[in-house]
Amino acid sequence: MKAVHFGAGNIGRGFIGQILSDNNVEVTFSDVNSAIVDALNHDHQYDVILADEARTTSTIKGVDAINSAQDPEKLHQALLEADIITTAVGVNLLPIIAKSLAPALKEKETPVNVVACENAIMATDTLKEAVLDITGPLPDHIHFANSAVDRIVPQQTHENILDVLVEPFFEWVVEADAWYGPQLEHIKYVDDLRPYIERKLMTVNTGHAYIAYAGQYYGHQTVLDAISDGKVESGLREVLNETSQYIIDEFGFSEQEQADYVEKIIGRFKNPNLSDDLTRVGRGTLRKIGPKDRIIKPLNYLYEHDLAHEGLTHEAAFLLKYQDDKDTETVEKNKYIQEHGIEAFLKEYAQIDSKLAAEIESVYNQL
């Protein structure tokens, strides 16, 4: 089998590419980073290093890459030959990926699975809609399968730019009925994906974001330093207790099952062999304060059902306080707040009502 994976970054190489390669799939990465593309085509291999005490290392072999900006015809041909097409580029870039993908899928005569591996709810649907806007209806042998992905891959540098450090834990869940052909090892196939996507997003991503925003507020620079601060861990647990209420109510996980999941996630955040800059975790504040994202979606549910939501209210306020002049979304956030105020910002970007916006603003003013 052959796969084309859009995004040769750390997630692409250290998670999706590794799993595909472990299934004896020939992986071709597509990226615009010339240094990464050239290195992949020179070495045809790289190391994935686990963030455990032994630094367990595996070598991913037989890979190559295409510079999608410089060689679109080669990418088009690779897409025509692919059995699997995956992405890990960030959900905001999926419409751009669709422009490369659409002509090949329109022309393609053989079955293919298309899977967007992004930190977003039903990201493959987002990609599919962008493709169909270009192509119109596609034949039945083009299979779009939603997925949920979970693996912490920190910002890092290595002597070999291809090598990547990842946490030992990973989870890749895919819609079973949308997938065509043999199921791959190390991927969990389920009938209903949404509980897994939302549980991950509202636990891992909500928690990670809280650590970033509260951590910076309390003067920390890394996830490990922040989670070692009792104030941050206490606030994190309050937030995850609240999102757990949403998850249990919506999807029927038992209280014990969700509590065990939360403890596992907090344990991952505390991994002494793995830390990350808060600026990498915190960036993209406009997306992360969105109405369907990790903070506002559970907060709105709890607010509307008159359930405890003080932790999430604080998380939203910490996000509003967050500073990073290298992140364009945070710069835009700060400019909008300065010109229009907190309530106007929350109405525009979080799309919440005035009363909940006032609650968040009150906490913001007390910080």
Curated annotation (Swiss-Prot):
UniProt GO MF annotations: mannitol-1-phosphate 5-dehydrogenase activity
Keywords: NAD, Oxidoreductase
GO biological process, one term: mannitol catabolic process
Binding site for NAD(+): 3-14
PROSITE patterns reported for this sequence: MANNITOL_DHGENASE
Record-stated family: Belongs to the mannitol dehydrogenase family.
Name of the protein this chain belongs to: Mannitol-1-phosphate 5-dehydrogenase
Gene, per the UniProt record: mtlD
